[in-house]
């Protein structure tokens, strides 16, 4: 019985920026789950890519989307930065769309003031109608 191993040539990759010291280049670490055929258990496999960041907008810790280039820009740079999915420290819950830190939602003081003002206005409208 032979095990067929396929290499992944992904055009789009999501990873975390681990370095930005090179000019217009971001060092991105991508983690994939790989099945061990003997143990039948998945293990993390990490790979590091270099991506062209023309505007130098990445910072260490950002979650980014990379696009494969048709022709490599350099010996190691074979991808370009397509989009910053999440900036470091500015995580937004995909279900509610609210900013969060860990398991708690962050509310700005302005949003809490506007909710209090809207409640006060609703009370005033109800009392004036009666």
From Swiss-Prot:
Presence of keyword Ribonucleoprotein: yes
Gene Ontology cellular-component terms listed: mitochondrial inner membrane; mitochondrial small ribosomal subunit; mitochondrion
Record's keyword terms, sorted: Mitochondrion, Ribonucleoprotein, Ribosomal protein, RNA-binding, rRNA-binding, Transit peptide
Any one Gene Ontology BP term: mitochondrial translation
Transit peptide, residue positions per record: 1-20
GO molecular function, one term: rRNA binding
Pfam families: Ribosomal_S17
Subcellular location: Mitochondrion
CDD domains cross-referenced by the UniProt entry: Ribosomal_uS17
InterPro entries referenced in this protein's UniProt entry, alphabetically: NA-bd_OB-fold, Ribosomal_uS17, Ribosomal_uS17m_metazoa
First-listed, main subcellular location of the protein, grouped into a coarse class: mitochondrion
Subunit structure: Component of the mitochondrial small ribosomal subunit (mt-SSU). Mature mammalian 55S mitochondrial ribosomes consist of a small (28S) and a large (39S) subunit. The 28S small subunit contains a 12S ribosomal RNA (12S mt-rRNA) and 30 different proteins. The 39S large subunit contains a 16S rRNA (16S mt-rRNA), a copy of mitochondrial valine transfer RNA (mt-tRNA(Val)), which plays an integral structural role, and 52 different proteins.
PANTHER family to which the protein is assigned, alphabetical: 28S RIBOSOMAL PROTEIN S17, MITOCHONDRIAL, SMALL RIBOSOMAL SUBUNIT PROTEIN US17M
Sequence similarity: Belongs to the universal ribosomal protein uS17 family.
Protein's name according to its UniProt entry: Small ribosomal subunit protein uS17m
Taxonomic source organism: Homo sapiens (Human)
């Amino acid at each position: 019985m032979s095990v067929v191993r396929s290499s992944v040539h992904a055009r789009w990759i999501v990873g975390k920026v681990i370095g930005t010291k090179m000019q217009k280049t971001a060092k991105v670490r991508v983690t994939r789950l790989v099945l061990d055929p003997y143990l039948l258990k998945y293990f993390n496999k990490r790979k590091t890519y270099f991506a062209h960041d023309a505007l130098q907008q990445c910072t260490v810790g950002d979650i980014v989307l990379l696009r494969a280039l048709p022709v490599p820009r350099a010996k190691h740079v074979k991808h370009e930065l397509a989009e910053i999915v999440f900036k470091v420290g500015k995580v937004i819950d995909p279900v509610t769309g609210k900013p969060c830190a860990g398991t708690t939602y962050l509310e700005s003081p302005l949003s809490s003031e506007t909710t209090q003002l809207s409640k006060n206005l609703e009370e005033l409208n109800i009392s004036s109608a009666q």
